[in-house]
Design a protein with these regions (language model features):
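Short alpha-helical segment immediately N-terminal to, or the first helix within
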Residues: 27-28, 130-134, 145
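Short, polar N-cap/turn motifs at the start of nucleic acid-interacting alpha helices
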Residues: 45-52, 116-117, 136-159, 180-186, ...
Length: 195
């Protein structure tokens, strides 16, 4: 369940797991992205000025470009990853061969090293549950954060924006939750009263 994630993150950060694996797994949890999206992330996809990770359409399951807002902790992870940068463009290269880390590497880190009885993909489900159960964000905000295609054809035809401001706020709250500093941000709806 998502309640356990702050302690999992803390254990991950203190673990003796290799630095690329540790950083990739935390980045995956913070971004709520798919394993292959994170493991194949390239430096050329990062725009620190706009605080965005721009995943090209050809790497997305939905075949649509996906923009992921970078939180403060995600930027810190990227700074740490620069120290292990090899001659290629990968953010999280395998220290053994410079190629992307394998899906199995993250699975073993989570299940064997951290003793978490969950899949890496289950981290995305935990994000979705957290968003649904503890926030007031509309369902489509978390769906867009997960990079899901809009299944309703009419809505898809009219949806032009990517809800970036709301997604950025959601991901900041997710980061706060994961860090154990769950700053509950209360959103008030003020009704205009005329006398």
């Amino acid at each position: 369940s998502f309640d356990e994630l702050p302690s999992i993150i803390e254990r991950l950060q203190k673990s003796q797991i290799s630095q690329p694996t540790k950083l990739a797994l935390e980045f995956l949890i913070l971004s709520a992205c798919r394993t292959t999206e994170v493991l194949n992330a390239h430096w050329s996809e990062i725009d620190l000025n706009k605080e965005l990770w721009i995943i090209p359409a050809e790497r997305m399951k939905s075949s649509r470009r996906h923009e992921v807002p970078l939180t403060k902790r995600m930027v810190e992870i990227l700074e740490e990853a620069k120290n292990i940068k090899l001659d290629n463009n990968l953010i999280f290269p395998s220290p053994l061969n410079g190629r992307p880390l394998s899906n199995n590497t993250l699975r073993l880190a989570l299940q064997k090293r951290l003793k978490v009885p969950a899949t890496v993909h289950g981290m995305r489900a935990a994000f979705k549950d957290w968003a649904a159960e503890t926030t007031n964000f509309a369902n489509e905000v978390s769906e867009m954060a997960l990079g899901h295609a809009i299944s309703n054809k009419v809505e898809a035809a009219y949806r032009r924006g990517n809800l970036m401001a709301k997604r950025r706020q959601m991901m900041e709250e997710w980061m706060q939750f994961l860090s154990g500093h769950d700053a509950k941000i209360v959103r008030l709806q003020i009704k205009k009263v005329t006398l």
